[in-house]
């Protein structure tokens, strides 16, 4: 019953938005792509040794406890390269900007890109062109929620979001000016 109410409301709002849309021919579509290198938060030799010791003592290696899972991740991350290459894209469709980031982007990061974009409207697509884990802000790293714990799903340097924000805003700036300079 409740789902029917919600579905009808969504349908009505969608219909009104569609009906009131301004359609136009010949909308310009442009795109800029850049790849940037970001650091990997690697464990120290002591952290790896402690993780291996914990795993050696695990009661059931097939059913690890949470701290043992993170120990396993510490060992795995030690084998990662020191940097990873991350593909970023920015598209312009008319006055709309679209940013594609291969991470689970925190809301505050997407909102910052939207608010600082030189284009009239901008939205962010997360988990695009790959997967590089969570993308917390430096402030979130300081708070230390599970999304920041070093693992295969959170391994980028603590300043990764800052670098991604600045790079995508530069890309949107290129698109807003209608030039192709600065893109790959």
Range-by-range predicted roles:
Residues 1-184:
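Non-catalytic substrate/cofactor recognition surfaces at enzyme active-site rims
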């Amino acid at each position: 019953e409740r789902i029917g109410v919600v579905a009808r409301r969504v349908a009505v709002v969608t219909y009104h938005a569609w009906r009131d849309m301004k359609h136009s021919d010949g909308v310009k579509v442009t795109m800029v792509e850049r790849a940037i290198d970001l650091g990997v938060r690697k464990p120290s030799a002591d952290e790896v040794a402690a993780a291996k010791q914990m795993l050696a003592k695990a009661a059931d290696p097939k059913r690890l406890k949470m701290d043992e899972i993170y120990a396993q991740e510490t060992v795995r991350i030690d084998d990662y390269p020191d940097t990873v290459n991350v593909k970023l894209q920015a598209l312009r469709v008319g006055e709309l900007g679209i940013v594609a980031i291969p991470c689970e982007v925190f809301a505050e990061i997407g909102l910052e890109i939207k608010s600082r974009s030189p284009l009239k409207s901008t939205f962010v697509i997360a988990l695009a062109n790959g997967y590089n884990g969570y993308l917390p802000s430096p402030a979130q790293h300081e708070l230390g929620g599970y999304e920041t714990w070093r693992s295969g799903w959170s391994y980028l340097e603590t300043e990764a979001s800052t670098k991604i924000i600045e790079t995508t805003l530069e890309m949107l700036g290129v698109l807003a000016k209608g030039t192709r300079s600065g893109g790959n």
